[in-house]
């Protein structure tokens, strides 16, 4: 809301100045500055943000006009020797050059003196000049400080806006939250000195008060998010992460993913709770139930996505499903309820590849360290590569051991220079780490398979907010490639492929149903891609697996028909409230007409409608031709445009497309997900659990808000005073 600051007959609204009686003032904006029209006279002009007087010749016989520039309320003109004059500040008595002979200097330097804090009297008495009546006593006890009787300078921006301690504390709390600053920054001397230089009136609070401010921000943003959830038209899916601290405390993060009434995807952190044992399904179930109750969404849970990859995943998931099914109405008997993180499985498979050749990778790391140890050695290696006419333009670099993509890129670059490594070993007695020919074959095989994982991860990263339908494409191609690779005759390639396929095949069996249902909701593919891909993977048994998917899609759709979600205002606006009984609709459609002699025809139509029921939305959707595949296709926008055509099926699509198939989908985090339980930093883990939750959740929420309010004008304007 625009901030208002009143002064006598003028009021500042936002960045504008208007009279309190609503009448317009004659004013003019020049550059970034608002200047009253009466002050723009003769030689005064606005240049940039400054009001200056243009140089002019004064004929000695001309009548001198009264000076109306604002600065002359603060300066007097005094004659000095040689016919020159100087401008003298009325407050500090400092003088400035003004005229010499027939030339008059500009007034910009005079204006800077009174507006930028150069005048010591104005600097010391700024507050008193704004608030005390004329005739007040200055802080030095030197008597009355002269105050302009009619007008004074003031900025319209925040620099001179009314100071608000509470608002400033709230902004400080948001800064701490967004930038992960420690709460005790408010006690650091350098910080307090900096704040004092900006606003001496700001009272720096203690750590306990700042904790309260952080929690207040958290509560306010939580209320706003709660209102959004109250109008959410569909269900919500949870992405669950496990955390620990250096004190071995356990935390669970719960992020909700959903599609709003405008068919926009959102993911918001809901809770960050401390639990006794995060790896226990009972503790995790309690955390989920608490979160759903806290957000009033007990009947809206659709799926949960876990990033664990333990051997007891089936038992873990079954126990979790059984516990929550007693308190929540799980769709499709809970078959889709527990989803495993795709990014995690990619990382787990990649780690299997790296582990299979860890000895070779160690030698390559040591070789690169040797080459990079000195400029002379690096230059020698470059000369060898040039002599061998190696065409590669890749640069040797060390990897980050926690990010498998960097290991892949390191191996890929080293593979191009394998001859150079061997030549360096024969020409330098200090180097003996060159991999053998068999080692390089292992590296080649590893790079071949790591490329599959690398490309799959980048395909997911290409989408800003990947919907669940995108993951089927990556998963089925990877399943097919690894399945075929296990039959390769080369033992080096086949042995690595077998380890990879064993792990990924477990993921495929657990998740291929939810992946397939998601791609059916893509109008570019529907059941056709499922049929095609399953024929490649399962061969003659494909029809059996296709039927499983088809039956599940129809069963899930029937659940949406029989048990629609509670209507929300957003859904009603989209035309989803037409749930009149079929018999009533058919009666209205076939009501006998009168007076046209076609009563028998109407009865015939009624009989046809009874004997030949119309297709369901799902059957109509599946029977229609596929939507053309284009690069810029937006699946959420397609369903938004077809909501009225498929009112029930669109509800099903909204929930399915919002399933978080991956805990992470962007940045380097996708290459390091699932490397173990994540560690909470010492700063946060030392805080109380409720403050930790406030810091983590509020940071997630605030990043979706505008960073700063619109910056106001900093123009100097004239304000009348009594």
From Swiss-Prot:
Gene disruption: observed consequences: Reduced plant size and amount of seeds.
One Pfam family hit: hAT-like_RNase-H
Region of interest (HATC (Hobo-Ac-Tam3) domain), ranges: 617-702
Compositionally biased region (Polar residues): 580-592
Binding site for Zn(2+): 89, 92, 113, 119
Entry-linked InterPro entries: hAT-like_transposase_RNase-H, HATC_C_dom, RNaseH-like_sf, Znf_BED, ZnF_BED_domain_contain, Znf_C2H2_sf
Key words of the record: DNA-binding, Metal-binding, Nucleus, Transcription, Transcription regulation, Zinc, Zinc-finger
Positions of region (Disordered): 572-592
Entry annotated with the keyword DNA-binding: yes
Gene Ontology terms: biological process: post-embryonic development
GO CC terms, sorted: nucleus
SMART domains: ZnF_BED
Intracellular or extracellular location(s): Nucleus
One GO MF term: DNA binding
Residue spans, zinc finger BED-type: 66-126
Oligomer and partners: Homodimer.
Function description: Transposase-like protein that is essential for plant growth and development. May regulate global gene expression by recruiting other cellular factors.
Protein name as it appears in the record: Zinc finger BED domain-containing protein RICESLEEPER 1
């Amino acid at each position: 809301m625009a901030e208002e600051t009143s002064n006598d007959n003028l009021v500042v609204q936002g960045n504008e100045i208007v009279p309190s009686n609503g009448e317009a003032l004659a004013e003019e904006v020049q550059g970034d500055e608002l200047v009253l029209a009466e002050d723009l006279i003769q030689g005064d002009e606005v240049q940039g943000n400054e009001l200056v007087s243009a140089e002019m010749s004064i004929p000695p016989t001309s009548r001198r006009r009264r000076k109306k520039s604002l600065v002359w309320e603060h300066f007097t003109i005094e004659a000095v020797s040689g016919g020159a004059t100087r401008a003298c500040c009325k407050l500090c008595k400092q003088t400035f050059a003004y005229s010499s002979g027939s030339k008059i200097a500009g007034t910009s330097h005079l204006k800077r003196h009174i507006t930028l804090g150069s005048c010591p009297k104005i600097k010391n008495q700024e507050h008193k000049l704004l608030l005390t009546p004329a005739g007040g006593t200055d802080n030095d006890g030197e008597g009355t400080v002269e105050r302009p009787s009619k007008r004074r300078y003031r900025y319209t921006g925040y620099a001179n806006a009314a100071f608000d301690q509470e608002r400033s504390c709230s902004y400080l709390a948001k800064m701490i939250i967004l930038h992960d600053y420690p709460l005790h920054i408010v006690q650091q001397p350098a910080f307090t000195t900096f704040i004092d230089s900006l606003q001496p009136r700001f009272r720096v609070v203690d750590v306990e008060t700042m904790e309260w401010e952080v929690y207040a921000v958290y509560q306010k943003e939580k209320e706003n998010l709660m209102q959004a959830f109250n109008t959410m038209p569909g269900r919500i899916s949870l992405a669950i992460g496990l955390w620990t601290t250096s004190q071995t405390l356990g935390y669970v993060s719960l992020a909700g993913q959903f599609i709003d009434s405008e068919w926009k995807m959102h993911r918001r952190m809901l809770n960050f709770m401390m639990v006794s044992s995060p790896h226990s399904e009972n503790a995790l179930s309690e955390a989920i139930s608490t979160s759903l109750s806290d957000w009033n969404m007990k009947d809206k849970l659709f799926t949960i996505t876990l990033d664990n990859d333990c051997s007891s995943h089936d038992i873990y998931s079954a126990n979790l499903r059984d516990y929550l099914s007693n308190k929540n109405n799980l769709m499709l008997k809970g078959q889709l309820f527990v989803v495993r993180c795709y990014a995690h499985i990619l990382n787990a498979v990649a780690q299997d590849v790296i582990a299979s050749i860890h000895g070779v990778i160690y030698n390559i790391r040591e070789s690169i360290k040797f080459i990079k140890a000195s400029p002379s050695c690096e230059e020698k290696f470059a000369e060898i590569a040039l002599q061998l006419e190696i065409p590669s333009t890749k640069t040797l670099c060390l990897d980050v051991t926690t990010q498998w993509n960097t290991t892949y890129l390191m191996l890929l670059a080293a593979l191009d220079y394998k001859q150079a490594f061997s030549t360096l070993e024969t020409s330098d007695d200090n180097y003996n780490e060159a991999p053998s020919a068999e080692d390089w074959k292992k590296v080649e095989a590893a790079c071949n398979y790591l490329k599959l994982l690398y490309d799959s991860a980048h395909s997911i990263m290409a989408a800003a907010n990947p919907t669940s339908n995108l993951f089927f494409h990556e998963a089925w191609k990877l399943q097919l490639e690894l399945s075929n690779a296990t039959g390769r005759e080369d033992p080096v390639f086949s042995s690595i492929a077998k380890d990879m396929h064993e792990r990924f095949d477990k993921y495929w069996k657990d998740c291929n149903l939810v992946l397939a249902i998601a791609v059916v909701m893509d109008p570019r593919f529907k059941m056709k891609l499922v049929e095609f891909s399953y024929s490649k993977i399962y061969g003659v048994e494909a029809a059996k697996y296709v039927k499983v998917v088809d039956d599940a899609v129809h069963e899930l759709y029937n659940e949406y028909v029989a048990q629609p979600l509670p209507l929300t205002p957003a859904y009603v606006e989209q035309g989803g409230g037409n749930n009149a009984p079929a018999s009533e609709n058919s009666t209205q459609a076939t009501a006998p007409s009168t007076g046209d002699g076609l009563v028998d025809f109407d009865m015939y139509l009624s009989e046809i409608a009874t004997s030949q029921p119309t297709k369901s939305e799902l059957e109509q959707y599946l029977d229609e031709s596929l939507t053309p595949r284009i690069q810029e296709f937006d699946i959420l926008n397609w369903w938004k445009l077809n909501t009225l055509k498929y009112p029930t099926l669109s509800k099903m699509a909204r929930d399915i497309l919002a399933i978080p198939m991956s805990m992470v989908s962007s940045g380097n985090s996708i290459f390091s997900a699932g490397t173990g339980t994540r560690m909470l930093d010492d700063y946060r883990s030392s805080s109380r659990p409720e403050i930790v939750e406030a810091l983590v959740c509020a940071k997630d929420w605030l990043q979706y808000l505008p960073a700063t309010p619109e910056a106001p004008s900093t123009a100097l304007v004239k304000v009348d005073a009594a």
